[in-house]
Amino acid sequence: MVQKQYRASPVILVMVLLCTASSFAEAQAESSDETVAHGKALVEAADCGSCHTADPAKPFAGGKRIDTPFGAIYSPNLTPDRETGIGAWRDEDFHRALRYGVRRDGSRYYPAFPYPNFTKMVRDDLLAIRAYLATLTPFSNEAPPPALHWPLNYRVVMRVWNWLFFKPGILVPDQQKSTEWNRGRYLVEGAAHCGACHTPKNLFGADKKNRPLGGGLVQGWFAPRLDGAERSGLKSWSADDIVEYLQSGRNGHSNADGLMAEVVANSTSKMSDADVRAIAVYLKDFPPGAAEPAVTPPPPTEMTAGAAVYAHACVSCHETDGSGAPRIYPPLPGNANLQSADPSSALRIILDGAQTLTTPRAPNTGSMPAYAGKFSDQEIADVTNYIRNSWGNAAPPVTASQVAKARKRQ
């Protein structure tokens, strides 16, 4: 039997190839769009914009001054400008920066850039971030060089720091925990880098490994404990309370102020419901951590003096019993931030005043005037001690000298 051989028509072959190429291009475009959207969500979770935007008209163009205990650094340009941004970077350059804290020229970043957290993220997520940043409007903006104290002004010193305190590696899921819990951990310890502010640091600016999420001082604000501590942690907050706070900037316990207000506005209020819920689930499972310090109440004379200042300046909004107007003027009894061992945030708010953050979920607002020019250091100390030790609250005493130091940070 003779077998007939068939030869495909050139026209048909071209049509098949064109259709295949078209389908592949469409699939690739869809994948690219999906990757960019995923990267955008991660950039928002990481709150990149807060540190890398100095001029709101030039988002992500860097140049923002960030003060640290070791001097000042300036955030770099993340836009795709080829000369001053990351437009000329390869994927491997970007991956190496976030995974290992290594700059394109081979020198080391300073850990104010939270690569100790980003190292825990999977490669695909890191490159999704790059994919999104590549879609931004490029701006030419060269950040100033760091202004750090000797010897940290030499980046080579960071090799020693990394050897002592940095362990690169992707976070391994805990198979004994739920998918939601593991997602929350990935965000808290990785992308959202909560510990960069909420974990106390040692003398070299590295996390104290024995006190994760135990509260930390950042640019004159105290980022409170996120562990299960009874007075100054999240023990009294439910998962729903945490979700409401992260999405709106307020709940029945507290309002977001200072740097945390930026985080809510630029990051957590934009995250998906599922991711915010995952963070809440993880944090509610976090152990109490270090014991809270025993507190000796202030002398009755100081409490009486503080009560007089409170009656004069605070009672009209916060009420005699401290109940306030929840979600506008936060309640003072049981307020974890107010009872933190470090009073820095309370002093900043009393001295500088506060404006309630508005978000799509909480558009109404309230304000608190600044009292720096109205009361003496001792009067500020008295009223701070009063609200930190009334209505069942308990916190270490604040002195007039602490208030004086807080004034200098204004």
Regions flagged by a language model, labelled:
Residues A41-T53, P76, E92-Y100, P111, ...:
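C-type cytochrome heme c attachment motif
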Residues A61-G71, T199-H253:
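Active-site substrate-binding loop specific to GH73 endo-beta-N-acetylglucosaminidase modules
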Residues D33-A54, P59-D67, V160-N162, V172-N202, ...:
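Sequence/structural segment immediately N-terminal to covalent heme-attachment motifs in c-type
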Residues M1-T35, I73-P76, A97, V102-D105, ...:
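Post-cleavage N-terminal segment of exported redox proteins
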Residues T53-A54, P59-K64, G106-Y109, S140-A147, ...:
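Short, solvent-exposed loop/turn and secondary-structure capping segments
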Residues D33, L42, A88-W89, K120-D124, ...:
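Soluble non-cytosolic domains of exported or imported proteins
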Residues A72-A88, D93, R99-D124, P145-A147, ...:
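Axial heme c-ligation environment in periplasmic c-type cytochrome domains
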